Amino acid sequence: MPGVTVKDIDQHAVTKAVAVFLKKTGKLKVPDQMDIVKTAKFKELAPYDPDWFYVRCASILRHLYHRSPAGVGSITKIYGGRKRNGVHPSHFCRAADGAARKALQALEHARLVEKHPDGGRKLSSIGQRDLDRIANQIVFKQRDAAKQTGPIVISK
């Protein structure tokens, strides 16, 4: 089905599939310190998932597909959260800009993202092609799974 895009299907499935694609192709170079770094100053620990960098890059790609261009500042705002201050009130806190910057640089090095003349980064034509191709694969897998199960028969 040629008309299927990323906007037409479940976003969690897109993010998971793109993360698997990024890891399998080997286009994305993960920085050395990303296995021990925290994703934000309001977090207590580093992520448990060893592939969190691929998932974060996939999420950034999906975000750039919908709303482009976006820079490091907007990415840190998206992944921000609540900083708990003990007995004091909680406040919003941005995510770590180092992780966002390294993710955007890795995507740019893989030629999935390119710099926008007005600032920030936008999805390149190669990145959009890959995301649409992955969306088509997800739809075909869902259709094949529906064909395998067949019609639902209710007996009395």
From Swiss-Prot:
The keyword Ribonucleoprotein applies. GO terms for biological process: cytoplasmic translation; ribosomal small subunit assembly. The keyword Transcription does not apply. Keywords: Ribonucleoprotein, Ribosomal protein. Coiled coil: none annotated. Pfam families: Ribosomal_S19e. InterPro entries: Ribosomal_eS19, Ribosomal_eS19_CS, WH-like_DNA-bd_sf, WH_DNA-bd_sf. Belongs to the eukaryotic ribosomal protein eS19 family. PANTHER family: 40S RIBOSOMAL PROTEIN S19. This is Small ribosomal subunit protein eS19A. It comes from Drosophila melanogaster. The lineage of its organism: Eukaryota, Metazoa, Ecdysozoa, Arthropoda, Hexapoda.
